[in-house]
């Protein structure tokens, strides 16, 4: 019998993040408590979002609005890393990064967790920014998926190519 396998990845649907950003921008433009504060949200490059406002409290509230929209679009908060508000002239600015891919350190943590706590006979391989998990039994793979979903990791994980 052939080995079964799946891949562990950390990817964010760019279109869903864009939809959340547009919804947040619309809410910031129409909400009463943001009137006159010149609060804006926009892309900064491909993987970062920039929020600006006239006060520190308003920019923090804008970050909360954006996080709420991300949650409604089923995007994990582990994939969004908002920095601290920084004063620049008369405005405050927050830059948040959209994290994609599994870093080398996180990949090592995940493979060590699977090796130590997972069922015997499960093998892991780090392949760039994803991890391949193989086993002779599909039940073992499902056990590994359940274990990783319960684990408190710093990365939003998705499980793809289950075969």
Swiss-Prot record:
Domain of life from the UniProt record: Bacteria
Protein name: Nucleotide-binding protein MMAR_0920
Family: Belongs to the YajQ family.
Functional description taken from the UniProt entry: Nucleotide-binding protein.
HAMAP family attached to this UniProt entry: YajQ
Keyword set, alphabetical order: Nucleotide-binding
GO CC, one annotated term: cytosol
Keyword Transmembrane helix: no
InterPro entries per the UniProt record, alphabetical: DUF520, UPF0234-like_C, UPF0234_N, YajQ-like_sf
Gene Ontology molecular function, alphabetical: nucleotide binding
């Amino acid at each position: 019998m052939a080995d079964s396998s799946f891949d562990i990845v950390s990817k964010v649907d760019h279109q869903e993040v864009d939809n959340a950003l547009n919804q947040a921008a619309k809410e910031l433009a129409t909400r009463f408590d943001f009137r006159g504060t010149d609060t804006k949200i926009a892309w900064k490059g491909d993987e970062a979002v920039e929020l600006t406002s006239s006060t520190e409290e308003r920019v923090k509230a804008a970050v909360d609005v954006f996080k709420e929209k991300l949650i409604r679009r089923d995007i994990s908060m582990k994939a969004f890393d908002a920095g601290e508000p920084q004063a620049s002239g008369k405005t405050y600015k927050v830059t948040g990064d959209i994290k994609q891919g599994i870093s080398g350190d996180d990949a090592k943590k995940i493979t060590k967790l699977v090796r130590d706590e997972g069922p015997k006979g499960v093998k892991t391989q780090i392949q760039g920014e994803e991890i391949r998990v193989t086993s002779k039994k599909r039940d073992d793979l499902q056990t590994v998926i359940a274990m990783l979903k319960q684990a408190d990791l710093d990365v939003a994980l998705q499980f793809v190519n289950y075969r």
